[in-house]
C-alpha cells in the first residue's frame, strides 16, 4: 500500500486535499506502522515540522519515503535525503522549479532533486502532465536506473462509463481536472499509455519498458519477484503489438480476462 498525505504542505497540495492536511503526528504514524506491515511507501512534504523524524522512523521500518507536494529547496532536499526521503513523487508536479523572488533567483525542488545523485524520481508520462522535452530531460539527467513511470491515476482510469461522484473534479481532454480548471487533479492513463508516450518522446523502447517494470520494482524493494522475467519470479507478462497496444496480459501466471486478442 502507498500512502500519500496527510502530511503535506497545503501550499502545494491542491484543492483536493483541502482541510485534510496536518504535520506529521508521531503517535499516529508509529501506531499505524506497528499494527500493519502492508504500508510499503509513504509520501510527505519534508519541510513540515517533524517530517525528518518521520522519515527516519519509516526508513527503519523498511518503508520507502517519497518527497511530495513540497516547496523544499536544495538544503531542505539534502537534509530530507539524508533522513530517508530517497524518492520523489510525480516529479515536476506539486513542486516548484527555478524561480524568482523580487530581484533574487532561487533553485526549486526540481533542480535540488536533480543535484541529489542518489534520489530516484517518477514521471507521469501521460503526455499531458509533462511535455516530451521534460521527459527527455529527466531521462537524460537521472537515467533509466533512477527514473520510473507512474500513472498517478485516479479510480476513473480505464473505467468506461464510470460516473464521476466527486463534484470537484471533471474528466476533460484525457485527464482529470479540478472543476474550476485551476489545476490538474490526476491522471486517467494506464501504464501502456505511458510507455507509448515515452517512445514518442524519443526514449528507446527498452529503456521505456524498464522504467515501467524493473526500475520501479527495485525502487519499491520488490525486485526479488517483480519487474523481470526470471526463474522463481512472479509470472507477470504483457504482450504488445508493434504499435505498443496490449494484446494479452498474464498476472501471476494466469491470463487476465478480456485481455487476450492473440488467439
Q: Regions from the language model: what does each represent?
A:
Residues 105-123, 139-151, 156-240:
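His/Asp/Glu-enriched, well-ordered alpha-helical/loop segment
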Residues 243-250:
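Short, Lys/Arg- and Gly-enriched loop/turn segments at beta-strand edges
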Residues 33-159, 177:
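Active-site core of metal-dependent hydrolases
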Residues 22-26, 45-48, 52, 103-107, ...:
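Electropositive phosphate-/nucleotide-binding environments in soluble metabolic enzymes
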